[in-house]
């Protein structure tokens, strides 16, 4: 048992299954669960966990929460109504806060505008209209443990 730190969880296939099992390692109240990631797709299995939709499943209407996931709301960090602390930190936020490790002009040249928004500005990809949505591609993946 101990603290659980899960990095890049928006890129883990079958995230809900992993979370259900791994969270048991930090089930005692003295341990912490910390999840952090660059966003992937709105259809990723981790999105309901991030958005609060997972918390709302099976709850009465009066007990459901509505979480404002906007950058302006979450940039300073916020303990939300579902008990999760959420924070969005973009590369531009980091630079404004004094981090001098990034060359934003170089990053804008290196990444396409869509990649920059997704990977560095914490915007989710809406792949619902894609020819191959992420959820369908993940269904084609092979798990070497199976």
Q: Model-flagged regions — what are they?
A:
Residues 7-9:
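Walker B catalytic acidic pair
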Residues 79-146:
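ATPase catalytic-site recognition across NTP-hydrolyzing enzymes
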Residues 3, 13-107:
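ASCE P-loop NTPase helicase motor core
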């Amino acid at each position: 048992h101990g603290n659980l730190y899960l990095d890049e969880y928006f890129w883990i296939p079958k995230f809900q299954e992993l979370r259900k099992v791994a969270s048991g390692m930090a089930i005692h109240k003295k341990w912490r669960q910390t999840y952090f990631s660059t966003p992937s797709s709105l259809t990723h299995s981790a999105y309901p966990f991030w958005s609060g939709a997972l918390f709302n499943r099976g709850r009465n209407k009066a007990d459901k929460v509505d979480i404002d996931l906007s950058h302006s709301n979450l940039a300073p960090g916020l303990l939300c109504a579902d008990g999760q602390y959420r924070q969005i930190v973009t590369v531009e936020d980091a630079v404004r806060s004094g981090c001098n490790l990034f060359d934003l002009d170089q990053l804008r040249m290196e990444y396409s505008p869509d990649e920059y928004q997704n990977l560095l500005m914490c915007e989710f990809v809406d792949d619902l209209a894609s020819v191959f949505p992420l959820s369908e591609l993940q269904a084609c993946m092979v798990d070497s443990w199976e």
